[in-house]
Swiss-Prot record:
GO molecular function annotation: heme binding; iron ion binding; monooxygenase activity; oxidoreductase activity, acting on paired donors, with incorporation or reduction of molecular oxygen
Induction line: By the diamond-back moth Plutella xylostella, the generalist herbivore Spodoptora littoralis, infection with P.syringae, jasmonate, cis-jasmone, phytoprostane A1 and 12-oxo phytodienoic acid (OPDA).
Keywords: Heme, Iron, Membrane, Metal-binding, Monooxygenase, Oxidoreductase, Transmembrane, Transmembrane helix
Keyword Disulfide bond: no
Membrane topology: Single-pass membrane protein
GO biological process, one term: defense response to insect
Gene Ontology annotations for the cellular component aspect, listed alphabetically: membrane
Protein name: Cytochrome P450 81D11
């Protein structure tokens, strides 16, 4: 009896499985099929496993524009990079649709190795996943770090560092033109400005204690900038992390970065007299809200400030001066505006910038042609959505080619020409996106523009400038890193104007 029961149970099980497979087969054969995704055009059929990784060439912004042109000037196109689906946007209208209509869905960030290891497991304001943690970081940044009140409290630092730059240039240029290497001076200016705001110390120039420490900081910044970006194949094809030792390199760099940032925090923590630096302020908040203001959060904020306020601002100043040297008529017009509005008895100050629209247009035009990040920081689709009529599956990475958008002939008249006057037309500045767009745009853009505009205005006001040679300066960009830097460092001929004597006299005891 027991044996018969076992046989019957076996028969029932076999019949059940048989009918289940019959049902499944019929459903697959005659049931509704999954909708085929309507994806943007792609440059070619992807290779097995690697996809379109073989198409990535530096600089990425030029390569992506070339791919867009090969697809009949596609406003958006798709790539399969290893295991990741990537959409590249080359249209202002499509970028706006991404970050207005789909702003929340596309507010996430992909986890790349630099963000994971250097960015404290992607917990910084720039790299954090969209959610409560990011909203808290954004609130901290908006209220405690980048508010107008906070930035105004550091105006004396910006003006002092610019005055030091003027004195440095004037030492050898009071009696005639001298050749000057501009890049190290701009890095000195921007690093000192940010580190004084953050930690109350200078790393370059008079009053510094350790030249080796200054070189160490500059080297760290350069290495992080070169290591970052959306073009690292190891972020799309994981096996390359081990084959190329890329992840090992990033981990070592992360250790050095953390050691430096922790040293800044520790120095301020043990000081008996509290200062007015960013770290002092954040440590005071840590005492009352330790869960929010952990050391990791504080170091992440400092890291973002240093990276966003040094290399990028120095690069923009170098491009701006190069443009002025290649367009002396623009330089003359800027000088006339400053002389007419400010006079020759005092230096231009931050509150004067509002009276110098042409100077502001020069900065805007520089950022148009040479955006700080030619490829905006990548976004990640947290849910399925539609952009420009195309399906955007969850997990898709969105890359925006700001460099291509800023040179789009459909958007700009004579886009390749350096023409600050274009921004005299109302609304032209709305087309710019050098600091991103939408809720993940750079919160520190105001600080960067304040320093760059004031520094550029001071250099125009205080010195005569000429090219070292008659030929135009080389305006090609470097292929390395996430930011747009000149391939060849700027050298210029500089001669002090009479107003510099007032600066020198004021600096004497």
């Amino acid at each position: 009896m027991s044996s018969t029961k076992t046989i019957m149970e076996t028969i029932y099980l076999i019949l059940s499985l048989f009918f289940f497979f019959i049902f499944l087969s019929l459903k697959l054969l005659f049931g509704p099929r999954p909708r085929k995704l309507n994806l943007p055009p792609s440059p070619s059929r992807p290779f097995p496993i690697i996809g379109h990784l073989h198409l990535l060439k530096l600089p990425l912004h030029r390569r992506f524009l070339s791919l867009s042109e090969s697809l009949n000037n596609a406003k958006i196109f798709s790539l399969s990079l290893g295991s990741r689906l990537v959409f590249v946007v080359s249209s202002h209208a499509v970028a706006e649709e991404c970050f207005t209509k789909n702003d929340v869905v596309l507010a996430n960030r992909p986890e790349f190795l630099v963000g994971k290891h250097i960015g404290y497991n992607s917990t910084t304001m720039v790299g954090a996943a969209y959610g409560d943690s990011w909203r808290n970081l954004r609130r901290i940044g908006t209220i405690e770090i980048f508010s107008s009140l906070r930035l105004n409290s550091f105006v004396s630092i910006r003006q002092d560092e610019i005055r030091r730059l003027i004195i440095c240039l004037a030492k050898n240029s009071q009696h005639g033109f001298v050749k000057v290497e501009m890049k190290p001076l701009f890095m000195c200016l921007t690093i000192n400005n940010i580190i004084r705001m953050v930690a109350g110390k200078r790393f370059y120039g008079d009053g510094t204690e350790n030249d080796n420490e200054a070189k160490h900081v500059r080297q760290l910044i350069a290495e992080v900038v070169v290591s970052g970006g959306a073009g690292n194949a190891a972020d799309y094809f994981p096996i390359l992390r081990y084959v190329t030792n890329y992840e090992k390199h990033v981990k070592k760099l992360a250790g050095r970065v953390d050691e430096f940032l922790q040293s800044l925090v520790n120095e301020k923590r043990v000081e008996k007299v509290k200062g007015n630096t960013m770290i002092d302020h954040l440590l005071s908040l840590q005492e009352t809200q330790p869960d929010y203001y952990t050391d990791v959060i504080i170091k992440g904020i400092i890291l973002v400030m240093i990276l966003a306020g040094t290399d990028t601002s120095a690069g923009t100043l170098e491009w701006a001066m190069s443009n002025l040297l290649n367009h002396p008529e623009v330089l003359r017009k800027a000088k006339t505006e400053i002389d007419d509005q400010i006079g020759v008895d005092r230096l231009v100050e931050e509150q004067d910038i509002v009276k110098l629209p042409y100077l502001q247009h020069i900065v805007s035009e520089t950022l148009r042609l040479y955006p700080v990040a030619p490829m905006l920081l990548p976004h990640l689709a947290s849910e399925d959505c539609i952009v420009d009529g195309y399906d955007v599956p969850r997990g898709t990475i969105i890359l925006v080619n700001a460099w291509a958008i800023h040179r789009d002939p459909k958007l700009w008249e004579e886009p390749e020409k350096f023409k600050p006057e274009r921004f005299e037309k109302k609304g032209e500045d709305k087309k710019l996106m050098p600091f991103g767009i939408g809720r993940r745009s750079c919160p520190g853009s105001g600080l960067a523009q304040r320093l760059v505009t004031l520094a550029l205005g001071s250099l125009v006001q205080c010195f005569e400038w000429e090219r070292v040679e008659e030929k135009y300066l080389d305006m090609r960009e470097s292929e390395k890193g996430t930011t747009m830097r000149k391939a060849t460092s700027l050298q210029a001929m500089c001669k002090a104007r009479p107003i510099v004597h007032k600066v020198l006299d004021a600096s004497c005891p």
